[in-house]
Amino acid sequence: MTIKEVSEKYDISQDTLRYYESIGMIPPVTRTSSGIRDYQESDLGWVEHVICMRSAGLPVESIIEYVKLCQEGDETIPARLQLLVEQRKNLLDQMEQMNVTLKRLDYKIDRYETAVKTGELSWD
């Protein structure tokens, strides 16, 4: 699959795909004999992984570290596990904070909706 096709499939720019590869967020992509990127299923798996992890807010550095560990072989499985466990905990912490914020917004929305109906704003 060409970089253009991958770009269209995942709605991500070609420049971003090149950047991800250049900084190590995805391993080097398979290339044709003339040096053109030729994304294979394994390459697409890495692209999907990066898109998912970035959309979850994982730091670029953590994604790069994970890719590096994967490339070093099975002896890094414990380190990969630890990295993923830490990132999962970070995501759970973020979700908890977002839930607190959501509750506060719900409360304020409720107060303002009541104020629109009654003509009076109350924080009781």
Residue spans for each PLM region:
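Basic helix-turn-helix/winged-helix DNA-binding cores
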Residues: 1-65
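C-terminal regulatory/oligomerization modules of transcriptional regulators
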Residues: 68, 72-124
